[in-house]
């Protein structure tokens, strides 16, 4: 390593997002190509819909085969899966999606083709909503809401922390679409359940964050505010003494990150970039249901 490179590396800020060029072989069609791939990122906070905020792209960018547009979301596929994916990717329908839809919306369609678990498809749709344009947003949220509602039905009797956070996402999407009264009713019903539903070694911290976010949602609803909003950080040092403050990018490790709900997306600061890209995309599809921070980046 040259001295200039070494000095530049040593001087790089801790909150870094890095990219590197990686060689790939497309699982569908065998095309060889290189792509700029995100290798690391740092999270400072999260939005109420789970999208990470910081020196990171959220959702984690998917690598795309330039020829046919296949998205690399797993390291390996079964023979039947490759046959089904190959036929779909070559179809006019999929090629049309390349010009009209986001990468995670297309990922959701690929997951549907191979009959992936419903939680994987739901996670892809959640991330698609983070990418959506103003025109796409209502349609994307409607699809994500329907997928998540099947994972955490309102009438579910076996409730836990994952059910709670999934319900919080449904309320967030209702608010974002200006459906304020259903959102208000949902959050008012959820708030008294937080302490009982959140379990685990970090339950006090997680429950405090969930309760703060629900209170924040109710304030936004009272104000008729449907905008995308940073979540409060109920566990920041100042918040511990003064209570919840307006949403800020203060503490990367926030509530639902510790709740172990299956929406976590991996993005460490050091890793082989090719493996990182494949793992991150696979985790985005595989582990999706509900983690308020969506776990992307350094902690």
Give the location of each predicted region.
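N-terminal cysteine/histidine-rich coordination modules
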Residues: 15-89
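"A position-specific structural signal for the A-helix of alpha-solenoid helical repeats
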Residues: 127, 169, 209-213, 217
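N-terminal signal peptide c-region/cleavage motif recognized by signal peptidases
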Residues: 9-13
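Flexible helix-coil transition and linker loops at the boundaries of alpha-helical arrays
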Residues: 106-119, 149-161, 196-203
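Compositionally biased, proline/threonine/alanine/serine-rich low-complexity intrinsically disordered stretches
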Residues: 230-299
């Amino acid at each position: 390593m040259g001295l200039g490179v070494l000095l530049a590396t040593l001087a790089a800020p801790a909150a870094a997002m890095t990219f590197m060029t990686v060689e790939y072989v497309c699982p569908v069609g065998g095309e060889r190509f290189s792509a700029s791939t995100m290798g690391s990122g740092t999270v400072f906070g999260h939005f109420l819909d789970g999208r990470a905020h910081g020196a990171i792209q959220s959702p984690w960018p998917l690598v795309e085969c330039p020829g046919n547009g296949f998205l690399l979301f797993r390291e390996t596929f079964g023979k039947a899966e490759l046959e089904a994916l190959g036929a779909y990717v070559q179809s006019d329908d999929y090629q049309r999606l390349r010009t009209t839809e986001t990468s995670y919306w297309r990922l959701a369609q690929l997951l549907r083709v191979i009959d992936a678990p419903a939680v994987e498809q739901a996670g892809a749709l959640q991330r698609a909503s983070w990418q959506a344009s103003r025109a796409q947003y209502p349609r994307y949220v409607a699809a994500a809401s329907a997928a998540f509602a099947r994972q955490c039905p309102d009438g579910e009797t076996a409730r836990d922390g994952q059910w709670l956070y999934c319900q919080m996402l449904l309320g967030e999407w209702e608010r974002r679409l200006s459906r304020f009264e259903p959102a208000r009713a949902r959050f008012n019903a959820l708030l008294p359940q937080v302490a009982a539903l959140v379990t685990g070694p970090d339950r006090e911290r997680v429950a405090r964050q969930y309760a703060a976010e629900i209170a924040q949602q109710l304030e936004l609803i009272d104000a008729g505010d449907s905008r995308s909003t940073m979540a409060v950080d109920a566990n920041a040092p100042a918040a511990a003494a003064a209570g919840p403050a307006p949403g800020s990018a203060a503490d990367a490790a926030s509530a639902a990150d510790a709740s172990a709900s299956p929406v976590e997306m991996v993005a460490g600061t050091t890793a082989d970039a090719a493996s990182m890209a494949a793992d991150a995309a696979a985790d985005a599809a595989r582990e999706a249901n509900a983690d308020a921070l969506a776990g992307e980046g350094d902690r």
